[in-house]
């Protein structure tokens, strides 16, 4: 769910997601690709709601580990994990000035 996604982003990037990415207006470049891939992963899910379904995961040795028997919830966890890791891997392209723009469709 959105809360779990936010917590994963915080764990991976050290940034408060709502403040740092909630209104991040640059949907181009790497950040846009991270979000686009996440949106596409979530759109492929069947049998669970990406915004409301809760899944289990843990943080072990600085790594997110998805632990779910339900295949849809496991895939959802993996989608959220992937976007959090993508954002972490691209922190060098994060532009604080773009954090207050309105979201633009991509």
From Swiss-Prot:
The keyword Disulfide bond applies. The record marks 96 as: Important residue of the cationic membrane-docking site (MDoS). InterPro entries: PLipase_A2, PLipase_A2_Asp_AS, PLipase_A2_dom, PLipase_A2_dom_sf. GO terms for molecular function: calcium ion binding; calcium-dependent phospholipase A2 activity; phospholipid binding; toxin activity. The record marks 15, 19, 104 as: Cationic membrane-docking site (MDoS). Disulfide bonds join 28-35, 34-86, 48-72, 66-77. The keyword Disulfide bond applies. PROSITE patterns: PA2_ASP (PS00119). Monomer, and homodimer; non-covalently linked. Also found as trimer, tetramer, and pentamer. This is Basic phospholipase A2 homolog BmajPLA2-II.
């Amino acid at each position: 769910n959105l809360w779990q996604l936010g917590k994963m982003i915080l764990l991976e990037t050290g940034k408060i997601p709502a403040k740092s990415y909630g209104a991040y207006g640059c949907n181009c470049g790497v950040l846009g690709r991270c979000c686009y891939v996440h949106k596409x992963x979530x759109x492929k899910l069947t049998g669970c709601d990406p915004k409301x379904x809760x899944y289990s995961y843990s943080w072990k040795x600085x790594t997110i580990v998805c632990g779910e028997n339900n295949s849809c919830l496991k895939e959802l966890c993996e989608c959220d994990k992937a976007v959090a890791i993508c954002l972490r891997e691209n922190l060098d392209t994060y532009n604080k000035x773009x954090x207050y723009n309105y979201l633009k469709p991509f």
